[in-house]
């Protein structure tokens, strides 16, 4: 969750069924719910949280349409490269290399558009949430065009970048602070964030690594 004194936004709220979750859907008070792609561990509790807070789900068009068909009362569709100024700040979607589909209870698969990363501009700060993604060269373009205060990068491997690729991503993006994510939730994505921190320090010492435990925060 990204918060200022006046506003809060949550990204990919996978709480129910998440063994690492430190909050419940009813605990969150937010102005918007941003979803990077349609996999169940990212769509998570988005619809419930958005409806409880009478706020929109923000994401690519197909995903927002799917959420509205599933009961979301408000949605704001964007697409890759698109941005919009909301009362809490500006949201811009950027590419991510991954998949995006929701597996229904009957095992049918529903296409939910392209996966995305998110640039979030709030209170004079820029936050980049990569979503689930592999390493790609245009991360340099994202870093060149935006002075990123805080970046969230996956390190778990298997479905996303591993530690070494995430270090390369950090070199391309050059954020002030980077937080590793998408690791340790399941055995197949076990990774050591301390190893990531050591390798970032060696490769780009001007970048600060913050390793957060569930419920912890970092201030900008």
What kind of feature is each model-predicted range?
Residues 68-83, 167, 171-220:
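Binuclear metal-ion centers of metallo-dependent hydrolases, dominated by the metallo-beta-lactamase
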Residues 103-172:
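Active-site-proximal loop/helix segments of hydrolase catalytic cores
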């Amino acid at each position: 969750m990204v918060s200022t004194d006046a506003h809060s936004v949550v990204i990919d709220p996978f709480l129910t069924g998440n063994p690492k979750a430190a909050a419940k859907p009813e605990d969150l008070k937010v102005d918007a719910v941003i979803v990077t792609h349609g996999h169940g561990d990212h769509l998570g509790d988005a619809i419930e949280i958005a409806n409880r807070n009478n706020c929109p789900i923000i994401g690519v068009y197909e995903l927002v349409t799917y959420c509205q068909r599933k009961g979301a009362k408000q949605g704001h569709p964007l697409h890759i490269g698109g941005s919009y100024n909301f009362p809490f700040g500006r949201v811009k979607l950027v590419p991510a290399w991954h998949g995006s589909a929701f597996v229904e209870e009957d095992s049918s698969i529903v296409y939910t558009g392209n996966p995305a990363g998110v640039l979030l501009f709030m209170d004079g700060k820029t936050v980049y949430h990569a979503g689930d993604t592999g390493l790609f060269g245009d991360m340099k373009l994202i870093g060149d065009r935006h002075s990123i205060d805080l970046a969230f990068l996956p390190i778990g491997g298997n479905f996303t970048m591993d530690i070494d690729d995430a270090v390369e991503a950090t070199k391309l993006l050059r954020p002030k602070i980077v937080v590793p994510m998408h690791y340790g939730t399941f055995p197949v994505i076990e990774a050591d964030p301390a190893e990531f921190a050591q390798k970032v320090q060696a490769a780009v010492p001007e970048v600060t690594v913050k390793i957060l435990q569930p419920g912890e925060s970092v201030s900008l």
